[in-house]
Amino acid sequence: MIQTTFPDRALMAELVAKMLWEIKAVHFNAAQPYKLSSGMASPVYIDCRKLLSYPRIRSTVMDFAASTLLRDAGFEQFDCIAGGETAGIPFAALLADRLGLPMIYVRKQPKGHGRNAQIEGNMPEGSRVLVIEDLTTAGGSMFKFIDAVRAAGGIVDHGIALFFYDIFGQQRFTDGKVRLHHIATWRNVLAVARAQQLFDDKTLAEVEAFLDAPLAWSGRNGGVSELSL
């Protein structure tokens, strides 16, 4: 199935943010910050994998992903969709079905030997591959999958994250010659929280302070204040 309707970008971002709140996939807690795997302290947390459990929301989000790619990348720019183990795999399958394309998945670690040791599925040499993840912060995990696809002979010029933290910019993607596509960010989630008055003003102000200066906020709240991006 090929998606051929193209909703406004701002509307898609707002709707995805509302969906994430509706299914309780996002959380704000400035008083007891979350500890991220990077060592950062954060007043925000998200679990995009919950999208998979809600068919109507899941279908709409994948329609938005297809629309974003067809409009911003083109209709004939990809030969294959790749999902990273594990969260990216179901979304890769859903997007590949939407776009009528083959799908592969990329292991975190090689299985066996050879240049295709991280690739599961059929990827001919020179295939133009789109890598999808449920979310990305600065691109570190996505580039592990991108590098594996490139090492196996694939061409990766584009990646898509359904949710982009958008707190560290896109320098990693610029340096890696990959265009990042995304649907929603923390700014969209915060805007919905404000509009619907989901939290008190102090909590919302703390979240905004984190988004404006994440490492400084982390350092003040028991987390690391420096990261290697």
Swiss-Prot record:
Keywords: Glycosyltransferase, Magnesium, Pyrimidine biosynthesis, Transferase. GO terms for biological process: 'de novo' UMP biosynthetic process; pyrimidine nucleobase biosynthetic process. Its EC number is 2.4.2.10. Pathway: Pyrimidine metabolism; UMP biosynthesis via de novo pathway; UMP from orotate: step 1/2. InterPro entries: OPRT (IPR023031), Or_phspho_trans_dom (IPR004467), PRibTrfase_dom (IPR000836), PRTase-like (IPR029057). Its cofactor is Mg(2+). Catalyzes the transfer of a ribosyl phosphate group from 5-phosphoribose 1-diphosphate to orotate, leading to the formation of orotidine monophosphate (OMP). Orotate binds at residue 137. It is an enzyme of class 2 (transferase). This is Orotate phosphoribosyltransferase. Coiled coil: none annotated. It holds the Pfam family Pribosyltran.
